[in-house]
Amino acid sequence: MPGSPARPNFLVIVADDLGFSDLGAFGGEIATPNLDALALEGLRLTDFHVAPTCSPTRSMLLTGTDHHIAGIGSMAEAIAPEQIGQPGYEGYLNERVVALPELLREAGYQTLMAGKWHLGLTPELAPHARGFERSFSLLPGAANHYGFEPPYDESTPGILKSTPALYIEDDQFVEQLPEGFYSSDAFGDRLIQYLKERDQARPFFAYLPFSAPHWPLQAPAEVVAKYRGHYDAGPEALRQERLQRLKQLGLVAEDVQAHPVLALTQEWERLTPQQRAISARTMEVYAAMVERMDWNIGRVVDYLRRQGQLDNTFVIFLSDNGAEGALLEAFPKFGPNLQSFLDQHYDNSLDNIGNANSYVWYGPRWAQAATAPSRLFKAFTTQGGIRVPALLRYPELRRQQGQIDHSFATVMDITPTILDLAGVRHPGSRWRGREVAPLRGKSWLGWLSGETGAPHDEHHVTGWELFGMRAVRKGPWKAVYIPAPLGPESWQLYDLSKDPGEIHDLAKHEPAKLAALIEHWHEYAEETGVVLGRSPFQPD
């Protein structure tokens, strides 16, 4: 970039299942001073979109194209029979794409990673095989944050078998995690170590994808204690408090209507005192996980500041999907004996929740406190599943601090933006003798520098599909298809400029608009190779 003393560094930070309003800078009450500071020195994006779940988003982030092309057409843990063996449904980052770290390393960047991978479970599919010079990563989609695992046998539920504490450093599996291991601390430690050991003459690309605050909800007891009693009024009270702060901060419109809560669980008022206490404790632990993640982000940022590198580092933070509202015990894929197995091998008593030998999640009502005013949560193609908090800091591009931008953007834009800033050209359709997918995302460089408007105009079309859930957007108009029981199993139509909560279905009032959008979705599905199949996660 003209006038820059050196090629910029990059720090890409991903939270796992973070809700839209969890951060202080996005209306939350959780202590996140480090991310809040980045937001106040940079730019907050209020209409940033991802895939409905984790591994699809990660594949899009690192390739700039759609997850159906990149090999994660469905999550490997949830592939439908119709999808097995189909192109784009390999369950790992395939060879039809070139990964961002591969291109940056080829261009002289030092590529570093510490965090969750979820794009392949074997050494030949691990981060070091896709361009990272140094990497310490959790390979599966989740794991006990302390590395605790009871003995597994044929009775172990599928969800636990698919989420072992399987870590790899470069090309070697980690046989024994150190005493006192905690995922977020370990990722912060390792990335700082790699930054200290790096070749100072080369710019760096650092990828820091946390596995927090994904279930199982676990955090250091001293951090959990800070939130004792904070959530005793229940999720609906929290939802209203956060909505009010979102309005005060200018992140949503003053007159926004929030979508009603949709949940297969009892309302707070109908719970027993013990049930309320346990539910509130899970939220306390969740909050502590978010705070601890922020603390580790602060350690990395402080290191870069002390080294004089922060202002030459493009920092971007995002969540990989909406807040997690699933009731794990309701899904047959996770194993019909999940609850009995947890009762046998874990201690989920009130005083033990959050410790290494506990295993809990917080459910749909707390999730919808975090996704409001949007509809539903993770795994859905409604706004609650795909619209997430995102912020960036890079003084070279944004001179005004604390800005908020309501332009539409997508996770596929990150790779072309970073390549543009680094002065690296994407190879297009061929790389190292093989065909690769071109970019679908758009660079933000002109937009962020103020030279052009938003990267996606009102004619741009973006499609989504996962687990049979579908959506397509063109300008403010969005069509969405959600199967039963939490959707009508038919296409719905919304004008997000007037109805961001997806409350007022205009399908019957604007049939031509809906038909055009459905046609756009079919074009998207054909371009990307969508294969529809029933979701194994759908409740019986």
What are these regions (language model features)?
Residues 133-146, 355-386, 398-498, 527, ...:
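C-terminal cap/loop subdomain of S1 sulfatases and analogous C-terminal strand-loop tails that border
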Residues 1-43, 52, 106, 117, ...:
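Active-site-proximal N-terminal segment of extracellular/periplasmic enzymes that hydrolyze or transfer
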Residues 23-24, 86-94, 174-182, 231-233, ...:
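Active-site rim elements
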Residues 28-60, 64-69, 108-112, 130-139, ...:
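Short, structured active-site-proximal loop/turn typified by the sulfatase FGly-forming signature C/S-X-P-X-R
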Residues 1-8, 15, 19-20, 44, ...:
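Long, internal low-complexity/basic segments
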Residues 21-27, 50, 57-60, 70-75, ...:
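Short, solvent-exposed loop/turn and secondary-structure capping segments
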Residues 73-106, 118-224, 228, 233, ...:
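Formylglycine-dependent
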Residues 122-131, 218-219, 302-393:
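Histidine-centered active-site microenvironments of extracellular/periplasmic hydrolases
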